[in-house]
Amino acid sequence: MKVIRVKNQEEGGQVAFSLLKESLAHGAKTLGLATGSTPLTFYKEIVKSDLSFSDVTSINLDEYVGLPVEHDQSYDYFMRENLFNHKPFKENYLPNGLAKDLSVEVSRYDNLIAEHPIDFQILGIGRNGHIGFNEPGTPFDIRTHVVDLEESTIEANSRFFASKEDVPKQAVSMGIASIMESKMIVLMAFGKEKAYAVKEMITGPITESLPASVLQNHDNVIVIVDEEAASELD
């Protein structure tokens, strides 16, 4: 696991984008994408670049269950607003959180990932060490699945909704086994509240109680952290 320390989130986005450019130059065709505030500067770098993504497919990590794609807190909406409306891709895939049969949707998404092996996966990390919506206790061998969100995750996401009661309680998430099959993983973390999770991910035991710790078993992970997120590292 290689750690790159940056001054701030803007520099972090620039570093992540330079890694992506290198990956694309070596033939990467499928990007695994994340939502939330962490990758926003990375997406801004993609949007303002003159690189063409017309041959590139994207596969997102997760989507809430029950939110229409028009809802401004759906991850589909987030991706369109921050990336897809500004930079055309060959294909963009997200889980369908409105599927009538979520078990069928889980199988569909696993098949999609199998058809489009991920070359470059961008990740954030939750305060509790979750990646995607793979919460503590998630088996490392799981693939796409329906998740009951942890109270801490619901709490963290409540700032984006009118009230905590409006936050979805479930999501469809790519599984840890699928994430680990990505050829390259770039995890970004910014802010003091991520410092403990970053430290445990890098130096702690590999344990399902901190899902991101499994990344120690991957041979091509780059962690981009600002000074605050790196503050508990030696």
Curated annotation (Swiss-Prot):
The active site is at D62 (proton acceptor), N128 (for ring-opening step), H130 (proton acceptor), E135 (for ring-opening step). It holds the Pfam family Glucosamine_iso. CDD domains: GlcN6P_deaminase. Pathway: Amino-sugar metabolism; N-acetylneuraminate degradation; D-fructose 6-phosphate from N-acetylneuraminate: step 5/5. It catalyses: alpha-D-glucosamine 6-phosphate + H2O = beta-D-fructose 6-phosphate + NH4(+). The keyword Hydrolase applies. Keywords: Carbohydrate metabolism, Hydrolase. Its EC number is 3.5.99.6. One of its GO terms (molecular function) is glucosamine-6-phosphate deaminase activity. GO terms for cellular component: cytoplasm. Catalyzes the reversible isomerization-deamination of glucosamine 6-phosphate (GlcN6P) to form fructose 6-phosphate (Fru6P) and ammonium ion. HAMAP family: GlcN6P_deamin. This is Glucosamine-6-phosphate deaminase.
